[in-house]
Curated annotation (Swiss-Prot):
Keyword Iron attributed: yes
Keyword Iron: yes
Name used for this protein in its record: Catechol 1,2-dioxygenase
Keyword entries, A-Z: Aromatic hydrocarbons catabolism, Dioxygenase, Iron, Oxidoreductase
């Protein structure tokens, strides 16, 4: 579960960078 959350967090960060 913790790993899943970490992966989701990373994907969100990438999405944010994409917006920039």
């Amino acid at each position: 579960t913790a790993a899943n959350v970490k992966i989701f967090n990373t994907e969100e960060v990438q999405n944010f960078i994409n917006l920039l």
